[in-house]
């Protein structure tokens, strides 16, 4: 490197002597690929990619926290993997979503909004960016509560280096306004941004995405502001939400640009994470055909090296989820292994890395299935027209059909879909529980949404993780604490937020998560 540096310095010196530094040095010294000159559409795509955790940030937080809190995926290991399994604040992992969104996603998307807001030829890109910005901020505020919002990601634009923290109530009010204006503002007769990687510039699909996200945001407020929730649910339905799985907001990966959850679980974490017993037990008890697509068990494995294809079984009847409340030592005692009928901790069921978590498996942000299930709840509350049972059935069917998007081998035959729907009709007496339990299944592998809707709805009715050492005072973790770095770089503002919100702990409830 030193040799190359000396060579380049010598070359530039020679050029100056031969031509005069003032003549063309400014031209030579101009960075033709300066990020500040990148096309906004390119920056928009990068924001979409980064929000999908393609760069790895946030993935470990989902694995250690969100998936574990909702008891779908769990690890028995501690140290760097400690989290929901031990009801513990692991300061190495709880800041990861914060870091990814503020350092990458929001810096990019705020820049796109700023660069296109006054350009009459880029109104569609401007409104697409506003929708993606709302999606990104929803994840952040749902995860942490009060956060920098109005002054966030404006260090370059406005030289704001210590942004204030806005209340979640104020954030949601603005998110809903932004989604309302941006979704309505999309216009297929104007310049179409055909290079966008989410919908290829399809304005009709972007509109349906925007209104479906508005529905999701509106339903977040069911416990704390039902009047506003109803208002925006009505707006979303009127505007037009997703109509089929073709409208899903999905990131499609390739062999080169991998699904980062799959990347983690196919590499260094391959033997560390397992399907949790409550999730497996629910799917088994209901003869759910999704279990065959989701789970694999390396029957009889007594160590990581024995988790090989010859032992792999996707037969639903042999799947065994790892119980909650154990670490790698206690789950390996002879009594526990005998109780669950497994040879070792490596014998519990895992996520199938050849189907839903193969390296090029898609990742879903907002889906038709989720949207129909939210409409079912809205109809149950009397906030929209339509039949609750019809929305419910459409939502469950949509997710069953969605399994085919992962891999042809994960597709569920129509006969199996129909049999499952026939066996599990909506029970009006248990409608909210049924709807949101199906939402739990339909949101598998979408950590932020799983965590948010579980807190909002209270379903499924999970049992508290019984791990003996716990840092929480609630039955479940309610939010992620702010990064320690914030107390160093933005102390006054973060302290104000902590005081307003009621503490910076795993047990502190965010505004919409009212008891």
Predicted features and spans:
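Membrane-proximal, proline-rich intrinsically disordered regions
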Residues: 21-75, 100-103, 107, 111, ...
């Amino acid at each position: 490197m030193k040799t190359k540096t000396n060579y380049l310095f010598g070359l530039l010196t020679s050029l100056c002597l031969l031509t005069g530094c003032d003549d063309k040095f400014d031209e030579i010294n101009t960075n033709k690929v300066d990020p500040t000159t990148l096309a906004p559409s390119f920056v928009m795509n990068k924001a979409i990619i980064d929000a999908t955790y393609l760069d790895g940030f946030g993935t470990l937080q989902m694995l250690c926290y969100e998936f574990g809190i909702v008891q779908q995926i769990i690890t028995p290991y501690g140290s760097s993997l400690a989290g929901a399994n031990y009801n513990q604040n692991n300061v190495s992992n709880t800041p990861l979503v914060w870091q990814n969104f503020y350092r990458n996603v929001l810096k990019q998307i705020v820049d796109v909004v700023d660069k296109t807001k006054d350009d009459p030829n880029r109104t569609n890109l401007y409104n697409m960016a506003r929708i993606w910005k709302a999606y990104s901020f929803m994840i952040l505020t749902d995860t942490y509560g009060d956060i920098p919002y109005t002054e966030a990601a404006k260090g370059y634009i406005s030289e704001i280096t210590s942004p204030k923290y806005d209340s979640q109530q104020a954030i949601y009010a603005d998110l809903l306004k932004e989604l309302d204006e941006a979704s309505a503002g999309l216009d297929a007769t104007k310049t179409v941004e055909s290079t966008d990687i989410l919908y290829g510039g399809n304005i009709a699909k972007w509109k349906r995405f925007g209104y479906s996200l508005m529905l999701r945001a509106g339903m977040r407020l069911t416990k704390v502001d039902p009047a506003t929730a109803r208002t925006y649910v009505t707006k979303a339905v009127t505007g037009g939400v997703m109509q089929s799985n073709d409208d899903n907001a999905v990131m499609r990966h390739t062999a080169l640009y991998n699904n980062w959850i799959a990347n983690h679980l196919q590499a260094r974490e391959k033997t560390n994470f397992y399907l949790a017993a409550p999730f497996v037990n629910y799917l088994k008890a209901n003869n759910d055909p999704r279990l065959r697509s989701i789970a694999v068990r390396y029957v009889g494995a007594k160590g990581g090296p024995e988790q090989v294809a010859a032992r792999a079984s996707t037969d639903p009847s042999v799947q065994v989820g790892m119980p909650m409340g154990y670490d790698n030592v206690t789950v390996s005692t002879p009594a526990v292994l005998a109780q669950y009928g497994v040879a070792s901790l490596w014998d519990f069921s895992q996520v199938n890395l050849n189907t839903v978590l193969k390296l090029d498996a898609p990742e879903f942000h907002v889906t038709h299935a989720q949207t129909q299930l939210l409409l079912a709840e809205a109809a149950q509350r009397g906030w929209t027209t339509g039949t609750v049972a019809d929305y419910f059935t459409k939502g469950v069917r949509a997710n069953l059909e969605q399994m085919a998007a992962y891999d042809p081998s994960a597709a569920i035959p129509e006969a199996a879909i129909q049999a499952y729907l026939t066996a599990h009709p909506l029970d009006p007496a248990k409608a909210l529980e049924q709807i949101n339990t199906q939402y739990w299944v339909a949101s598998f592998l979408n950590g932020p949404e799983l965590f948010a809707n579980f807190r909002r709805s209270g379903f499924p009715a999970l049992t508290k993780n019984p791990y003996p050492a716990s840092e929480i005072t609630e039955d479940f973790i309610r939010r992620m604490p702010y990064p320690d770095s914030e107390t160093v770089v933005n102390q006054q503002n973060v302290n104000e937020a902590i005081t307003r919100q009621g503490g910076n702990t795993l047990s502190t409830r965010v505004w919409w998560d009212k008891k």
